[in-house]
Design a protein with these regions (language model features):
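Transmembrane alpha-helices
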Residues: 23, 122-155, 181, 197
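Hydrophobic alpha-helical transmembrane segments of polytopic membrane proteins
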Residues: 163-199
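Loop-to-helix entry region at the N-terminal start of transmembrane alpha-helices
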Residues: 10-21, 66-94, 134, 178, ...
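Cytoplasmic-entry segments and transmembrane alpha-helices of multi-pass inner-membrane transporters
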Residues: 36-69, 87, 97-101
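Short, membrane-interfacial amphipathic segments enriched in basic
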Residues: 1-9, 39-40, 123-127
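Short cytoplasmic-facing helical segments at TM-TM junctions of multi-pass membrane proteins
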Residues: 98-137, 163
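Transmembrane alpha-helical segments of polytopic membrane transport and secretion proteins
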Residues: 1-2, 9, 13, 195-222
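Transmembrane alpha-helix signature in integral membrane proteins
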Residues: 11-39
Length: 222
């Protein structure tokens, strides 16, 4: 803890790098996974193919992908793009499954009601299914973001890892306080981001909060 308190400026600089490497892939993954999930949800064959591909992608070891990517996309070994591209692939693989699960959680009667009042397929997806899937979607997003924050530290092995660089430096110089500082900083970062996402999810779904408040009253009336 002493090491962290005496190196706050370095911790802040590494945190900014860590956030950049963690959150840019989340934005890219969401931009791909949400439309893809909406597209394949009602197509059984495409859905199976998509989920199978996502499962295969996530089984690839992250360190191996970080090392191989420069040969595939023509970047330098120490280019942040390697970590961003790799984590974008992992994020998409995780999020597409989360999107499908979130859409599946929307009650069928609400879809039927939307059709009954004249919503077309696109309008139903955007105005009914997607908003109602937010609670499950945010739960999946929280898992993905925390996973990314942890996986960025693996990049420190190849010289790009944000707070993870304290791990490798600590091991190389046998400074346990530096390793502990990296662990504490990364844990704190994950907790803060997860809390913010949880709060954002609640603000985006006020009807869920209202339902939780009413439930005990209804139960007591019985």
């Amino acid at each position: 803890m002493h090491y962290l308190l005496t190196h706050l400026s370095t911790a802040w600089a590494l945190t900014v790098i860590h956030l950049r490497l963690s959150l840019i892939p989340v934005a890219i993954g969401l931009a791909i996974a949400v439309p893809l999930g909406l597209l394949v949800q009602r197509a059984p064959l495409l859905r199976r193919l998509t989920t199978a591909t996502a499962s295969v992608i996530f089984t690839i070891p992250s360190l191996a992908l970080f090392v191989v990517l420069p040969l595939v996309i023509g970047t330098r070994i120490l280019d942040e793009a390697n970590v961003i591209v790799a984590l974008s692939a992992y994020t998409t693989a995780l999020m597409v499954r989360a999107v499908l699960e979130a859409l599946d959680a929307v009650p069928g009667q609400l879809r039927d009601a939307a059709i009954a009042i004249g919503y077309g397929s696109l309008a139903r997806m955007l105005k009914v299914e997607l908003p109602l899937s937010i609670p499950v979607l945010v739960a999946g997003l929280r898992v993905v973001v925390v996973t990314n924050i942890a996986m960025v530290s693996v990049g420190s092995v190849i010289g790009i890892g944000g707070l993870g660089s304290w791990f490798t430096a600590g091991f190389q110089t046998n400074k346990s306080d530096q390793i502990v500082a990296g662990i504490i900083a990364m844990f704190a970062l994950a907790v803060v981001i997860d809390t913010l996402l949880s709060l954002a999810g609640r603000l985006a779904t006020p009807w869920e909060h209202g339902r939780r408040i009413r439930s005990p009253i209804v139960g007591g009336a019985r």
